[in-house]
Amino acid sequence: MPMQGAQRKLLGSLNSTPTATSNPGLAANHTGAPCLEVSIPDGLFLSLGLVSLVENVLVVAAIAKNRNLHSSMYXFICCLALSDLLVSGSNMLETAIILLLEAGTLATRASVVQQLHNTIDVLTCSSMLCSLCFLGAIAVDRYISIFYALRYHSIMTLPRAQRAIAAIWVASVLSSTLFITYYDHAAVLLCLVVFFLAMLVLMAVLYVHMLARACQHAQGIIRLHNRQLPAHKGFGLRGAATLTILLGIFFLCWGPFFLHLTLVVFCPQHLTCNCIFKNFKVFLTLIICNTIIDPLIYAFRSQELRRTLKEVLLCSSWPGCWAEGGGDSVWPGSCVTLRGPLPP
């Protein structure tokens, strides 16, 4: 078939490197030295994407159903789930189209494949940017709720949250369109890498500051009750472990992808870098894994959301319960229309 290279690399705008060998395991580089290439089966990749898709759809549906969750904090969580849903969905769509093209089931012209290529690239890039932005927005929201607790509801009003959400979506779509259009410019890839590092630093600084404040608060309670200091140390260790897991998962899942982009800029022809380029699909798989983990960290820890999630699962077999579930039925994509929480 013609167009074989284009079919095999619909996400080629961000993976602008020599095509990896199709044989898994140890591939040889130009010097004949072994080069580790980890093969991700298409079935596994699609399965992970499907898990992420279902998981994030449930989060969006649960937040949309329960009016008690219609607050600025849950609006950010809702939009994080929606962006993660688009990340997994766009990658699943890309993989499915590639498989259909290679099997000859889907026959189309090269111009159509190129249009699909551009559309999926923009969708993937914009959803990735949105996911990173909403992770940062959640960190900022939690920081304000701790350090400005008495003024939180006057600072994080729903109209402000709506404007922030709309700005993130618009900026992400416009930026991704520019990035995909000028992907062959090193400055574009470096901008993506700098943006990732900025989000990483922002989250690290805010969460470390929140941990320090929590430890100070715990120490004050210990002194008030004349308890022993080791209890405070234990609390600090648990908090540090939680923070390490949160930031560690973020870095391990997103870091390799942006390392790939960095190497594309600085050593596109280097033998060692070429070995890393061969594992591009592994880096995408790690991002899909992050979209699976995000709801576990940010959404499912809420007891109210877990309770609503059970109702949503029950509602799947009883359509009428959406009108009786204590909240307006909101279209899952309309995160910016969520209202404030009901008074107690």
From Swiss-Prot:
Membrane topology listed for this record: Multi-pass membrane protein
Transmembrane regions: 38-63, 73-93, 119-140, 164-183, 192-211, 241-266, 280-300
Pfam families given in the database record: 7tm_1
Keywords: Cell membrane, G-protein coupled receptor, Glycoprotein, Lipoprotein, Membrane, Palmitate, Receptor, Transducer, Transmembrane, Transmembrane helix
Superkingdom per UniProt: Eukaryota
CDD domains for the chain: 7tmA_MC1R (cd15351)
S-palmitoyl cysteine lipid modification positions: C315
Residues spanning the signal sequence: none
The keyword Ribonucleoprotein belongs to this UniProt entry's keyword annotation: no
Keyword presence, Membrane: yes
Parts of the chain on the Cytoplasmic side: 64-72, 141-163, 212-240, 301-344
Parts of the chain on the Extracellular side: 1-37, 94-118, 184-191, 267-279
Cell compartments where the protein resides: Cell membrane
InterPro entries for this protein: GPCR_Rhodpsn, GPCR_Rhodpsn_7TM, Melcrt_ACTH_rcpt, MSH_rcpt
Cellular component, GO annotation: plasma membrane
Listed PANTHER family: G-PROTEIN COUPLED RECEPTOR (PTHR22750)
Similarity comment text for this entry: Belongs to the G-protein coupled receptor 1 family.
Subunit structure: Interacts with MGRN1, but does not undergo MGRN1-mediated ubiquitination; this interaction competes with GNAS-binding and thus inhibits agonist-induced cAMP production. Interacts with OPN3; the interaction results in a decrease in MC1R-mediated cAMP signaling and ultimately a decrease in melanin production in melanocytes.
Protein purpose: Receptor for MSH (alpha, beta and gamma) and ACTH. The activity of this receptor is mediated by G proteins which activate adenylate cyclase. Mediates melanogenesis, the production of eumelanin (black/brown) and phaeomelanin (red/yellow), via regulation of cAMP signaling in melanocytes.
Name listed for the protein in its UniProt record: Melanocyte-stimulating hormone receptor
